[in-house]
Amino acid sequence: MSIQTSDPNETSDLKSLSLIAAHSHITGLGLDENLQPRPTSEGMVGQLQARRAAGVILKMVQNGTIAGRAVLVAGPPSTGKTALAMGVSQSLGKDVPFTAIAGSEIFSLELSKTEALTQAFRKSIGIKIKEETELIEGEVVEIQIDRSITGGHKQGKLTIKTTDMETIYELGNKMIDGLTKEKVLAGDVISIDKASGKITKLGRSFARSRDYDAMGADTRFVQCPEGELQKRKTVVHTVSLHEIDVINSRTQGFLALFTGDTGEIRSEVRDQINTKVAEWKEEGKAEIVPGVLFIDEVHMLDIECFSFINRALEDEFAPIVMMATNRGVSKTRGTNYKSPHGLPLDLLDRSIIITTKSYNEQEIKTILSIRAQEEEVELSSDALDLLTKTGVETSLRYSSNLISVAQQIAMKRKNNTVEVEDVKRAYLLFLDSARSVKYVQENESQYIDDQGNVQISIAKSADPDAMDTTE
């Protein structure tokens, strides 16, 4: 057996792995300040009416006054329903919680359906908790650290000043280690949290800007603080209700947030937390931020889940629930009757419905051009036209998937630009759904049917030299 070894002198270019998702090109809804959609903006193309409706929902969420509303995004496949939800997510920012789940995610052996839905609802409610902390903020004048010969207890003094006053603080082991870790020197402007002992380096004083010293490119010069050394500052922490539930429900506390092993959380714990949060809200210590829960493929939920959502929407702590489905009149899971979009009529009655329409040829061309730019693929104009034609005749998803495949074929030809022949070869190598269905119908007898039957036919050879197997 031969073992291939690489030449040590040979250099290989290591490219960084950049994962590009289906909706990574979307950065917002593409609306102006009057909620009017631009034809192409922030990765969104077309669907003007649906985007404007989503913009109204976005304003409702940002105002934070209205919660417990259900929004259904309904439309044919490949019309941008998930993209619309991703646009809402990007526009909300990091302070407003956005939770995205698929309808099939809640069916788990570890959690009941109602528990999984409850956790998703609680993840979508944010709590802004205001906390007053005492800080020591000033410019370091001098640091004196006395270390014993035996390497035991360390002592030190920190001289710190503002423009109005100067003070000397005694340092213990923990503070000395913190200052050493942050590499604090004389002339640095620092902030010390009195409660936790956390040291934050704010920058270097302007008074030391002319000192002859080696400084990095990221060195920041700041003014020496004014007034008192000790200041009170209000800090705002944003957490979700689910995170508070987890911390208060298990023995390991916040460690369960990292392991993900939250398990079932008792309703008594949640009731106590709801009561405490309501108290904080009345006292002005906390502010409730209703977020968005997005349930994709909502028709996969069953009748018990829909009944739970009906009740949860009326709760005091309820987010805005966005749902997406591509079903028409279909059977509701867990029942024998059909209903529009596969949802019960009572939930449909509570929902406001946004419809998406199929993209036209020009919109498909624009979307494919954006996707190619996102995937860093250079397409020739003829190749883009052929991909657009393929997208119109088959589907947008199939045409979008051909971009990266055609790039690999072009790279094999040592060409950086994807040409028409690369797209044609990719089209012949990979079938779309319509051609796949046609192939299955033509060769149906060779496939195993739903009864487990398959027809295996062996054609007899007409070769005169073939071995005679007859007796």
Curated annotation (Swiss-Prot):
It is an enzyme of class 3 (hydrolase). The keyword Transcription regulation applies. One of its GO terms (cellular component) is Swr1 complex. One of its GO terms (biological process) is protein stabilization. It catalyses: ATP + H2O = ADP + phosphate + H(+). One of its GO terms (molecular function) is 5'-3' DNA helicase activity. Pfam families: TIP49, TIP49_C. The keyword Nucleotide-binding applies. InterPro entries: AAA+_ATPase (IPR003593), P-loop_NTPase (IPR027417), RuvB-like (IPR027238), RuvB-like_C (IPR041048), RuvBL1/2_DNA/RNA_bd_dom (IPR042487), TIP49_P-loop (IPR010339). Its EC number is 3.6.4.12. It comes from the Eukaryota. Gene3D superfamilies: 1.10.8.60, P-loop containing nucleotide triphosphate hydrolases, RuvB-like helicase, domain II. It is found in: Nucleus, Nucleoplasm. ATP binds at residues 75-82. Keywords: Activator, ATP-binding, Chromatin regulator, DNA damage, DNA repair, Helicase, Hydrolase, Nucleotide-binding, Nucleus, rRNA processing, Transcription, Transcription regulation. Probably forms a homohexamer. Interacts with RVB1 and may form heterododecamers with RVB1. Component of the SWR1 chromatin remodeling complex composed of at least ACT1, ARP4, RVB1, RVB2, ARP6, YAF9, VPS71, VPS72, SWC3, SWC4, SWC5, SWC7 and SWR1, and perhaps BDF1. Component of the chromatin-remodeling INO80 complex, at least composed of ARP4, ARP5, ARP8, RVB1, RVB2, TAF14, NHP10, IES1, IES3, IES4, IES6, ACT1, IES2, IES5 and INO80. Also belongs to the R2TP complex composed of at least RVB1, RVB2, TAH1 and PIH1. Interacts with SPT15/TBP. DNA helicase which participates in several chromatin remodeling complexes, including the SWR1 and the INO80 complexes. The SWR1 complex mediates the ATP-dependent exchange of histone H2A for the H2A variant HZT1 leading to transcriptional regulation of selected genes by chromatin remodeling. The INO80 complex remodels chromatin by shifting nucleosomes. Its ability to induce transcription of some phosphate-responsive genes is modulated by inositol polyphosphates. The INO80 complex is involved in DNA repair by associating to 'Ser-129' phosphorylated H2A histones as a response to DNA damage. Belongs to the RuvB family. Present with 3030 molecules/cell in log phase SD medium. This is RuvB-like protein 2. It comes from Saccharomyces cerevisiae (strain ATCC 204508 / S288c) (Baker's yeast).
